[in-house]
Amino acid sequence: EIKFKAFLDFAMQLGASKMATGHFVRTNENGDLLRGIDPNKDQSYFLYMLHQEQLRKAIFPVGGMTKTEVRRIAEENGLPVCKKKDSTGVCFIGERNFRQFLSTYLPAQPGDMVAPDGSVVGHHDGLMYYTLGQRRRLGIGGCGDGRSWFVIGKDLENNRLLVAQGEDHPMLYSTMSIGAEATWIGADPLAGGEPLRCTCKFRYRQGDQPVEVRRDGEKLLIHALTPQRAVTPGQSAVFYQGEKCLGGAIVEQILDAGQGKMDV
């Protein structure tokens, strides 16, 4: 809605028949969204909300090339971007510090960091600054058994950050989640009432995870066939069959945190 749709609508208003972007994805004659050839740069995860009509009007020239090939072509044509480092910032704020960006618009609400036994082991600067599974910048030291501390949850009602020791703590793992705002690029694969077996990415650059997806009213019930670490509400669950991106949904709720227990 913000970038792709606005750009496409503007291009059509100018009388263009197609628009081109630099995303590392591919399409076919059916208007399907396919992974980019370069597995390290594939960006289909970010475009799952598009539909076939939009994709038929889009061209992705670099989707069939690796990033190395793209840089080589840019260098051969004297384009200065050939030496530019890969961007790692959030696209709409650039390379600015993300914490500083948030603090400009959202007032911080400091609170306690709480261990599984209920003890306060530290203090946080605001829940918005932390993500499930985070280890760095917690500032917890001098307590516990010497292992690193990780964020295992957020108690929004009491403004508490829940933390525990060990990167494989059971509370970091789950297998069942609810997805909302489901978007399908083509036909709805659940329209017939049968569950969908496919693969899923719960975050960018994650390897393919086998899942079974069922309709649950207006939402999706996503069952990961292996325990998943640090699946977080607000993330996108994006579904694939081979090279084809089917669509996805926003993770709304984790149903069984701690149930997909790993050996620790």
Positions of the model-derived regions?
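Nucleotide-activated chemistry modules centered on ATP-dependent adenylation/adenylyltransferase
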Residues: 1-258
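Eukaryotic N-terminal low-complexity, Ser/Thr- and Lys/Arg-rich leader segments
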Residues: 261-264
